[in-house]
Design a protein with these regions (language model features):
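Conserved serine/cysteine hydrolase catalytic core
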Residues: 66-86
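Gly/Ala-rich beta-loop-alpha elbow adjacent to hydrolase catalytic centers
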Residues: 35-40, 44
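Acidic catalytic loop of the alpha/beta-hydrolase fold
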Residues: 67, 93-98, 125-127
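Active-site signature of alpha/beta-hydrolase-fold catalytic machinery across serine-
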Residues: 46-50
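C-terminal catalytic histidine-bearing segment of alpha/beta-hydrolase fold enzymes
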Residues: 101-150
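Short beta-strand/loop motif that positions the catalytic acidic residue
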Residues: 83, 88-91, 95
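A conserved short beta-strand
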Residues: 53-68
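Serine-hydrolase catalytic machinery in alpha/beta-hydrolase-like enzymes
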Residues: 1-31
Length: 150
Protein backbone atom coordinates (compact mmCIF):
# COMPACT_ATOMS: atom_id res chain seq x y z
CA UNK A 1 0.00 0.00 0.00
CA UNK A 2 1.45 3.40 -0.90
CA UNK A 3 2.09 5.98 1.79
CA UNK A 4 -0.58 8.61 2.41
CA UNK A 5 1.46 11.26 0.58
CA UNK A 6 2.14 8.93 -2.33
CA UNK A 7 -1.55 8.05 -2.58
CA UNK A 8 -2.42 11.76 -2.71
CA UNK A 9 0.11 12.32 -5.48
CA UNK A 10 -0.92 9.23 -7.49
CA UNK A 11 -4.67 9.90 -7.35
CA UNK A 12 -4.21 13.63 -8.03
CA UNK A 13 -1.91 12.90 -10.99
CA UNK A 14 -4.39 10.42 -12.48
CA UNK A 15 -7.28 12.86 -11.98
CA UNK A 16 -5.24 15.67 -13.55
CA UNK A 17 -4.55 13.51 -16.61
CA UNK A 18 -8.24 12.64 -17.01
CA UNK A 19 -9.26 16.27 -16.46
CA UNK A 20 -6.80 17.45 -19.12
CA UNK A 21 -8.09 14.82 -21.55
CA UNK A 22 -11.70 15.91 -20.91
CA UNK A 23 -10.70 19.55 -21.39
CA UNK A 24 -9.00 18.79 -24.69
CA UNK A 25 -11.56 16.39 -26.17
CA UNK A 26 -15.06 17.11 -24.85
CA UNK A 27 -16.83 20.40 -25.54
CA UNK A 28 -17.50 22.43 -22.40
CA UNK A 29 -21.20 22.37 -23.24
CA UNK A 30 -21.34 18.56 -22.81
CA UNK A 31 -22.08 17.01 -19.44
CA UNK A 32 -19.39 14.66 -18.19
CA UNK A 33 -20.12 11.97 -15.59
CA UNK A 34 -16.99 10.08 -14.56
CA UNK A 35 -17.54 6.52 -13.38
CA UNK A 36 -14.87 4.49 -11.67
CA UNK A 37 -14.39 1.22 -9.86
CA UNK A 38 -12.01 0.85 -6.89
CA UNK A 39 -9.01 3.13 -7.54
CA UNK A 40 -10.92 4.46 -10.56
CA UNK A 41 -13.69 5.49 -8.16
CA UNK A 42 -11.15 7.45 -6.14
CA UNK A 43 -9.99 9.16 -9.34
CA UNK A 44 -13.59 9.92 -10.40
CA UNK A 45 -14.33 11.60 -7.06
CA UNK A 46 -11.00 13.40 -7.16
CA UNK A 47 -12.02 15.10 -10.39
CA UNK A 48 -14.65 16.91 -8.32
CA UNK A 49 -12.03 17.80 -5.73
CA UNK A 50 -9.99 19.50 -8.46
CA UNK A 51 -12.49 20.89 -10.98
CA UNK A 52 -16.10 20.54 -9.73
CA UNK A 53 -17.62 22.97 -12.21
CA UNK A 54 -16.71 20.66 -15.11
CA UNK A 55 -18.44 17.48 -13.95
CA UNK A 56 -22.20 16.90 -13.88
CA UNK A 57 -22.08 13.96 -11.45
CA UNK A 58 -19.83 11.08 -10.38
CA UNK A 59 -20.35 7.34 -9.96
CA UNK A 60 -17.96 5.69 -7.51
CA UNK A 61 -18.15 1.90 -7.30
CA UNK A 62 -16.28 0.24 -4.44
CA UNK A 63 -13.89 3.17 -4.33
CA UNK A 64 -12.17 5.18 -1.65
CA UNK A 65 -10.85 8.71 -1.19
CA UNK A 66 -7.34 10.03 -1.40
CA UNK A 67 -6.58 11.60 1.99
CA UNK A 68 -5.74 15.03 0.49
CA UNK A 69 -3.16 15.70 3.17
CA UNK A 70 -0.65 17.00 0.63
CA UNK A 71 -1.31 20.70 -0.05
CA UNK A 72 -2.67 21.38 -3.51
CA UNK A 73 -3.84 17.85 -4.30
CA UNK A 74 -7.54 18.63 -3.73
CA UNK A 75 -7.83 22.39 -4.29
CA UNK A 76 -11.64 22.54 -4.57
CA UNK A 77 -12.54 20.74 -1.33
CA UNK A 78 -13.44 23.98 0.43
CA UNK A 79 -15.96 24.99 -2.26
CA UNK A 80 -17.28 21.62 -3.40
CA UNK A 81 -20.48 21.87 -1.34
CA UNK A 82 -21.47 24.99 -3.31
CA UNK A 83 -22.07 22.83 -6.40
CA UNK A 84 -24.35 20.13 -4.88
CA UNK A 85 -23.02 17.60 -7.39
CA UNK A 86 -24.84 14.25 -7.41
CA UNK A 87 -22.64 11.31 -6.49
CA UNK A 88 -23.63 7.64 -6.51
CA UNK A 89 -21.50 5.52 -4.19
CA UNK A 90 -22.09 1.78 -4.25
CA UNK A 91 -20.08 -0.99 -2.66
CA UNK A 92 -20.33 -4.63 -1.66
CA UNK A 93 -20.95 -5.51 1.98
CA UNK A 94 -18.48 -8.37 1.58
CA UNK A 95 -15.69 -6.27 0.03
CA UNK A 96 -12.44 -7.81 1.26
CA UNK A 97 -10.18 -5.41 -0.70
CA UNK A 98 -11.23 -1.96 0.53
CA UNK A 99 -11.43 -1.92 4.34
CA UNK A 100 -14.88 -1.11 5.73
CA UNK A 101 -13.55 1.94 7.55
CA UNK A 102 -12.34 3.34 4.20
CA UNK A 103 -15.77 2.79 2.62
CA UNK A 104 -17.51 4.39 5.60
CA UNK A 105 -15.05 7.31 5.65
CA UNK A 106 -15.61 7.88 1.93
CA UNK A 107 -19.40 7.80 2.42
CA UNK A 108 -19.19 10.27 5.33
CA UNK A 109 -16.97 12.69 3.39
CA UNK A 110 -19.15 12.47 0.28
CA UNK A 111 -22.30 13.03 2.37
CA UNK A 112 -20.78 16.22 3.71
CA UNK A 113 -19.48 17.54 0.37
CA UNK A 114 -21.85 16.30 -2.36
CA UNK A 115 -25.45 15.31 -3.07
CA UNK A 116 -24.82 11.69 -2.13
CA UNK A 117 -26.76 8.53 -2.84
CA UNK A 118 -25.08 5.53 -1.26
CA UNK A 119 -26.00 1.88 -1.36
CA UNK A 120 -24.33 -1.26 -0.11
CA UNK A 121 -25.02 -4.63 -1.69
CA UNK A 122 -25.44 -7.77 0.41
CA UNK A 123 -23.25 -10.66 -0.73
CA UNK A 124 -21.20 -8.53 -3.13
CA UNK A 125 -17.42 -8.62 -2.78
CA UNK A 126 -15.04 -6.19 -4.51
CA UNK A 127 -17.08 -6.27 -7.69
CA UNK A 128 -20.13 -4.80 -9.39
CA UNK A 129 -23.48 -6.46 -9.98
CA UNK A 130 -26.48 -6.23 -12.27
CA UNK A 131 -28.54 -4.96 -9.32
CA UNK A 132 -26.01 -2.17 -8.84
CA UNK A 133 -26.17 -1.22 -12.52
CA UNK A 134 -29.96 -1.22 -12.35
CA UNK A 135 -29.81 1.16 -9.37
CA UNK A 136 -27.33 3.39 -11.22
CA UNK A 137 -29.67 3.53 -14.20
CA UNK A 138 -32.52 4.67 -11.95
CA UNK A 139 -30.23 7.22 -10.29
CA UNK A 140 -29.18 8.64 -13.67
CA UNK A 141 -32.82 9.03 -14.70
CA UNK A 142 -33.73 10.58 -11.32
CA UNK A 143 -31.04 13.22 -11.79
CA UNK A 144 -31.93 13.78 -15.46
CA UNK A 145 -28.51 12.61 -16.60
CA UNK A 146 -29.76 9.97 -19.04
CA UNK A 147 -29.61 12.12 -22.22
CA UNK A 148 -32.01 9.73 -23.91
CA UNK A 149 -29.57 6.81 -23.94
CA UNK A 150 -31.23 4.88 -21.13
Amino acid sequence: MPSVDDLDHYIAAAARAVDQWVDGHIPATRDVVPIGFSQGGAVAVHLLRMHPERYRAVINLSGFLAPAGVPGTAPADDRLTDFEIPVYFGYGKNDAVIPKYELFAAAAWLEEHTWLTTKSYRGLDHAVSLDEFSDIRQWLVLHDIASGVL
